[in-house]
Structure formats: C-alpha cells, structure tokens
From Swiss-Prot:
Belongs to the bacterial ribosomal protein bL17 family. The gene is rplQ. GO terms for molecular function: structural constituent of ribosome. It comes from Histophilus somni (strain 2336). Coiled coil: none annotated. This is Large ribosomal subunit protein bL17.
C-alpha cells in the first residue's frame, strides 16, 4: 500500500530523480523560466520554493544547505544575491506553472515553470 508516500516517482530510481531535480532547479534559477513536462514542473515546485525561502536569510549555514541541495555555486550565488532579496516580502508562492499543450512525439503534457516576479519580456528585448 502506498499510504502517505509523497512525491512522484517519474519512472526513475532515487539517485536519478535527485540528479534530475538538481539540474532542473539550477536551470530554473539561472533562466527563471523553463519548459518541461507537467509532472516534473509540479514536483520541481517542491524543490525550488524551499531553496528560495532559504535564500531570504543570507548566512553561511544557509548557503551551505543550498549548495548541498543543488551542488552548483552559480545557482547558490544567484539565489542569495538576487532571488532572496527579490522575494523578501513574499511569503511563498514564488513559482508559476503555465500549461502549454502536449509534446508532439509522445503527447506528454508540457508546461512552463517560471519565477513570478521575473523581469518583463519588453525589458529583456531592450537589453538584447
């Protein structure tokens, strides 16, 4: 019986799942929007939101915890230098999931997952 077993297995063993979410979390923090399957996006929320909450208080201990969970120095730097201060006044709900149809090859439901207060697209176009 599967009583009280939380989280999705995603047809992977635990180390593969852990590596998958480390990579997806690093990609989301660096790009602030990524496209992935809907179940992965829903599960990624459970990884990224606690990291951003951790980044709201900048301490050596919190940086080490974030590094232990992501294993990426650039991700930790962006979390604590940019995202922590940006979301300082927001109490949770840092991500948004937007469904975007189905993948052509296998009809898997796809979604964009993004950080809610990311800079507008017009500003990005001006900088390019």
């Amino acid at each position: 019986m599967r009583h009280r077993k939380s989280g999705r297995q995603l047809n992977r063993n635990s180390s593969h799942r852990q590596a998958l979410f480390r990579n997806l979390a690093s990609a989301l923090v660096s790009h602030e929007i990524i496209k992935t399957t809907l179940p992965k996006a829903k599960e990624l929320r459970r990884v990224v939101e606690p990291l951003i909450t951790l980044a709201k208080v900048d301490s050596v201990a919190n940086r080490r915890l974030a590094f232990a969970r992501t294993r990426n120095i650039e991700t930790v730097a962006k979390l604590f230098n940019e995202l922590g201060p940006r979301f300082a006044q927001r109490a949770g709900g840092y991500t948004r999931i937007l469904k975007c149809g189905f993948r052509a090859g296998d009809n898997a439901p796809m979604a964009y997952i993004e950080l809610v207060d990311r800079p507008a697209l017009a500003e990005e176009a001006k900088t390019e």
